[in-house]
């Protein structure tokens, strides 16, 4: 009987064992960094009430109009697979009273879903790492988030391959004033606009500045600048932020058409971009969203955050040949040639794991000849092989072969293996 194979849904990819160690390294680097800064993890559902995203992201956005996975459940309620994390994080904070006269510094990690056209670096299920700081005013917290990003890039090895772009969206009344100016400009060039931009023109004209259509880039770059209509308070806030970046020694450039793709942003916004990934240039984006908590029924609460896609980070590290450097944890492969040797290998492996918790120990329990097992050992990336053959078992010795250097193979008593490893791997 021929049975059709079931394959993964387009744009939703499997992460196979050859890649998961690198993913784990990237994830653990993020987690370790945020813990050092005093941020705490929060977890919230993958599925939310559809109104959560319509109210926060904005109904006249590509995400809400075209990209959300929305469906009715068995009760007839409209629910949506989360397309981003900030809205769900804020909803959880309000629901559980985390913002009552409190400041929260939070991080989260997990899958998001958008029905976009799949391409390299952009998928329909993607993994996002997010950071949110709620209840804190001023530019110091914004500068802390930028500092976190810079440390992440340094820890991952590509700090010289990304650049920081910043802008200010000002207060809502300033955006409304700018909106009228921008609409007039765009109407004067209406014949140039694509259908998406024409549709956005009346309801959300700032979205036009977020267009990635190459035919519109000249028009966008020459559009009136929002920063030119900012009031004194917004200018002072943005200047304080820029001064702080200079004090911290963080290079940046002002991008006057940087508006972000979500409706809830105001004041400071930023993106980290790279020239290594073609059209997928943005690897991290964020900004201030002081009105979002109030949008969702909470008390007015200042807030700022950022998010980045792990697939995009993986792709950048792959492009820069950094993946091998990220997977350099020391490990040992134990070669055993028969059933008695395999049992000895299992006992030895547990002893090594007890004595050296940071060391990975791979035991070959499938048997096989020396040649095939050495191939497995080499492919595993292990630094050394411990060999338990018939001669070694008879003498209660273990042979040791360094797989990464030309050091000559040696044999030592089994009882001395932990002492040897302590000295050899120091």
Curated annotation (Swiss-Prot):
GO molecular function: ATP binding; histidine-tRNA ligase activity
Compartment(s) where it occurs, according to its Swiss-Prot or TrEMBL record: Cytoplasm
Reactions that this protein is recorded to catalyse: tRNA(His) + L-histidine + ATP = L-histidyl-tRNA(His) + AMP + diphosphate + H(+)
Keywords, sorted A to Z: Aminoacyl-tRNA synthetase, ATP-binding, Cytoplasm, Ligase, Nucleotide-binding, Protein biosynthesis
Ranges annotated as spanning the membrane: none
A single GO BP: histidyl-tRNA aminoacylation
Pfam families, sorted: HGTP_anticodon (PF03129), tRNA-synt_His (PF13393)
Coiled coil start-end: none
One cellular component (GO) term of this entry: cytoplasm
EC number: 6.1.1.21
Family: Belongs to the class-II aminoacyl-tRNA synthetase family.
Assembly, per entry: Homodimer.
Annotated protein name in UniProt: Histidine--tRNA ligase
Originating organism: Legionella pneumophila (strain Paris)
